[in-house]
Regions:
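Sec-dependent signal peptide recognition
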Residues: 2-10
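C-terminal motif of bacterial Sec signal peptides marking the signal peptidase cleavage site
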Residues: 15-16
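Short, conserved catalytic or interaction motifs in soluble domains
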Residues: 19
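Extracytoplasmic
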Residues: 23-285, 293-436
Length: 436
């Protein structure tokens, strides 16, 4: 978790201050009481170049902003409507800058020439609908090296007095956006689940950079596919070590995940930061609009260990591919805690929505019987539960489960909601003994 930094106390000092500031060209009522302070460090993105956010949106807010072509979007969610005053806490390094702003279809200009932090009124607006709001800033002219440094957007008036949701802390996680999950409770009532089968379809246009569409999750790991860059995609299978640490170098030898075998062209190694363990991935150019199949096996092995093996089926290849087989020490179990998730792992793309369909889930017991999993329990992570981000949803559509997150949409599914899809009866037809 990143530190929220020493600047936050400044935000809270502003929440009830009275402002009469002559520096802004847009008018705000005298004696405005600023009820909310939205830190740009957790709530702003460079809309025209999302990856530029990593250099322009810093721990203290917007900085190093020199290109006029960049459009800065600041997002926040309001439950109230009515009149709202808006201002920036901002400064310039030198000279004078003029910024263009857009909010709710209203546009205008702001002038800055203060080199100390000051409150720059933008103006008064009518908020007609509750939900996510977006303030957009663009640089127009500047005589100094940068357009402005902006620490926060301040809100006052009737619309700002109600409940507001925005990223207040843990900016790294808030910028990544909320992670959402589908748990399959029917599997918990099946004795000794050895195999878990799932299918995922990512519609065209939803394969957003930074997405991890996780198909086959279990208590000790997860298996799915990712969009890692504009040119690279991966099929990822990871198993956590029983030793609790975020640093794989700290894991004792007798608690390390051991590789048993791996598929052709599969990378294997260790991972950290969100637990630690064994990681394997295949670089594979999977495509949006195509349904891919995932198969996982988990069963006890000798010496209080458990073996986990993952296979991936791409219809364009027409065959199952081995990703890897891992042995986990100090573990004696079959598969349990079966679930799927959708997460964004790149903070710079946390303002872009992504969606996937999860369909035809099955679990196979040690007696050889397949069980269709037609029920799912929807949950979300702390970013969602704390109300830092509300752009998450999931459920059942057109016969399949789905997950969607990020992008500041207003549709939202209540956490801990149960869903049921129609049974397909399409039991997996797989020669389990013939798998690579």
């Amino acid at each position: 978790m990143k530190s929220i930094g020493p600047f936050l106390p400044l935000f809270f000092l502003l929440l009830s201050c009275t402002v009469q500031d002559p520096l802004g060209t847009a008018a705000a009522p005298e004696n405005t009481s600023w009820n909310k302070s939205i830190p740009l460090a957790g709530n702003a993105w460079v809309l025209d170049d999302l990856l530029a956010s990593s250099s322009l949106i810093q721990e203290n807010g917007l900085a190093n902003w020199s290109e006029a072509g960049h459009s800065i979007g600041v997002f926040f969610h309001l439950s109230g409507t009515g009149k709202m005053q808006m201002a920036l806490r901002a400064r310039v390094q030198s000279g004078e800058s003029v910024l263009n702003y857009t909010f709710g279809g209203q546009t205008g200009e702001i002038s800055l020439h203060n080199t100390d932090w000051a409150i720059i009124p933008i103006g008064a607006f009518d908020v007609s609908l509750p939900g996510y709001q977006r303030l957009e800033l663009q640089g127009k002219t500047r005589t100094g090296p940068y357009f402005a440094e902006v620490e926060a957007v301040l809100l006052g008036g009737a619309a700002a007095k109600g409940e507001a949701h925005y990223v207040k802390d843990e900016f790294y996680w808030g910028r990544r956006g909320p992670s959402v999950h589908l748990w399959y409770p029917q599997a918990d009532r099946i004795a000794q689940v050895e195999w878990f089968y799932n299918e995922i379809t990512v519609p065209e246009g939803q394969d957003v950079l930074g997405s991890y569409f996780m198909a086959n999750g279990f208590n000790e790991g997860y298996f799915g596919f990712q969009v890692n860059s504009d040119t690279e995609r991966r099929i990822l299978f990871s198993v956590w070590s029983p030793y609790q640490t975020d640093n794989p170098n700290e894991i004792p030898e007798n608690q390390k995940i051991k590789l048993l075998k791996k598929g052709q062209d599969v990378y294997t190694g260790e991972f950290g930061n969100e637990g630690s363990g064994g990681q394997s991935y295949l670089r594979y150019p999977w495509r949006a609009g195509v349904t891919y199949r995932f198969l996982l096996r988990g069963h006890p092995a000798a010496g209080n260990t458990t073996d986990y093996t993952a296979w991936f089926y791409a219809p364009e290849a027409g065959q199952w591919r081995l990703i890897a087989s891992w042995r986990r020490p100090k573990t004696n179990t079959y598969l349990a805690g079966l679930y799927s998730f959708l997460e964004n792992f790149i903070p710079e793309t946390g303002a872009t929505s992504r969606y996937a369909r999860y369909s035809n889930q099955w679990a196979r017991d040690t007696g050889g019987q397949w069980h269709e999993l037609t029920r799912a329990h929807f949950t979300a992570d702390d970013t969602a539960r704390k109300g830092n981000r509300l752009d998450y949803t999931g459920g059942m559509q057109n016969g399949a489960f789905f997950l969607r997150n990020c992008g500041f949409f207003n549709e939202r599914t209540e956490i801990d909601t149960d869903f049921e899809r129609p049974a397909t009866g399409k039991q997996p037809v797989i020669d389990l003994n013939g798998l690579p």
